[in-house]
């Protein structure tokens, strides 16, 4: 799982308290968080995780599909805000489902804002849309790792997108 430990625990609490039928996560990466959330849904006894990523590497897909929790996971490869991808996501959401969304893919402001607009309408009352890595906005350039993407500096990161969306 490539997330801050406190964020993982907070997400776990939200999932446990809201018991969503569907969790959509954009940004699969290695699949750790998708499988973590699937295991929580297994404990709850219901639900499925829809993982969306522009590039699901073959070895990561195999690892996820061979995992014991794969029965609670559907993977969609494609741009998270592309019409075709969004159509596939919608097809996997049964009618009257409680839907939670976690946005954790491309962290540039424009992309996160596009995801907020595209996926926000799928979140059902009583559930949440989580925008990951908003803490990036609080890292000063001089304190950031030298190999950090320039697109993540203040003003072009998830928190700026979230603030514009709200």
At which residue positions do the language-model features occur?
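S-adenosylmethionine/decaboxylated-SAM
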Residues: 2-166
């Amino acid at each position: 799982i490539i997330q801050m430990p406190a964020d993982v625990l907070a997400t776990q609490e939200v999932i446990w308290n809201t018991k969503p039928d569907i969790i959509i996560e954009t940004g699969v990466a290695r699949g750790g968080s998708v499988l973590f959330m699937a295991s929580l849904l297994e404990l709850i006894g219901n639900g499925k995780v829809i993982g969306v990523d522009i590039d699901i590497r073959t070895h990561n897909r195999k690892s996820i599909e061979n995992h014991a929790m794969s029965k609670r996971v559907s993977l969609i490869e494609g741009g998270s805000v592309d019409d075709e991808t969004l159509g596939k996501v919608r097809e996997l959401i049964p009618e009257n489902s409680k839907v939670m969304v976690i946005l954790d893919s491309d962290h540039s402001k424009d992309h996160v804002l596009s995801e907020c607009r595209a996926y926000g309408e799928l979140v059902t009352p009583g559930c949440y849309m989580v925008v990951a890595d908003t803490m990036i906005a609080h890292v000063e350039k001089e304190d950031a790792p030298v190999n950090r993407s320039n697109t993540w500096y203040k003003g072009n990161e998830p928190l700026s997108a979230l603030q514009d969306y709200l």
